């Protein structure tokens, strides 16, 4: 069999966030999401300013703990960005 060079060009992918990473929420990705619709009409500023610690990653979602006396939250990974 002859080998063919039909490889698709690799897309540049941002660095994946891992457990323990310091993150904040991307405001534009969050505002029109299902998570925003299910929450208070105005999200607290601290989630957009960060940092929050990424505790766990399961599939497309990450669990974030803020350095405040508030519950941990699950958000889609595409709504999170690195704080560093």
Curated annotation (Swiss-Prot):
The keyword Lipid biosynthesis does not apply. It holds the Pfam family NdhO. Keywords: Membrane, NAD, NADP, Plastoquinone, Quinone, Thylakoid, Translocase, Transport. One of its GO terms (molecular function) is quinone binding. It is a peripheral membrane protein. It is found in: Cellular thylakoid membrane. It comes from the Bacteria. It catalyses: a plastoquinone + NADH + (n+1) H(+)(in) = a plastoquinol + NAD(+) + n H(+)(out); a plastoquinone + NADPH + (n+1) H(+)(in) = a plastoquinol + NADP(+) + n H(+)(out). One of its GO terms (cellular component) is plasma membrane-derived thylakoid membrane. Its main location: membrane. Its EC number is 7.1.1.-. Signal peptide: none annotated. It is an enzyme of class 7 (translocase). InterPro entries: NdhO. NDH-1 shuttles electrons from an unknown electron donor, via FMN and iron-sulfur (Fe-S) centers, to quinones in the respiratory and/or the photosynthetic chain. The immediate electron acceptor for the enzyme in this species is believed to be plastoquinone. Couples the redox reaction to proton translocation, and thus conserves the redox energy in a proton gradient. Cyanobacterial NDH-1 also plays a role in inorganic carbon-concentration. NDH-1 can be composed of about 15 different subunits; different subcomplexes with different compositions have been identified which probably have different functions. Belongs to the complex I NdhO subunit family. This is NAD(P)H-quinone oxidoreductase subunit O. The gene is ndhO.
């Amino acid at each position: 069999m002859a080998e063919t060079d039909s490889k698709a060009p690799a897309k540049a992918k941002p660095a994946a966030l891992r457990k323990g990473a310091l993150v904040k929420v991307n405001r534009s990705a969050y505002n029109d999401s299902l998570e925003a619709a299910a929450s208070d009409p105005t999200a607290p500023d601290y989630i957009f300013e960060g940092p929050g610690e990424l505790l766990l990653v399961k599939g497309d979602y990450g669990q974030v703990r803020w350095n405040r006396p508030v519950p941990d939250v699950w958000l889609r990974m595409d709504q999170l960005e690195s704080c560093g």
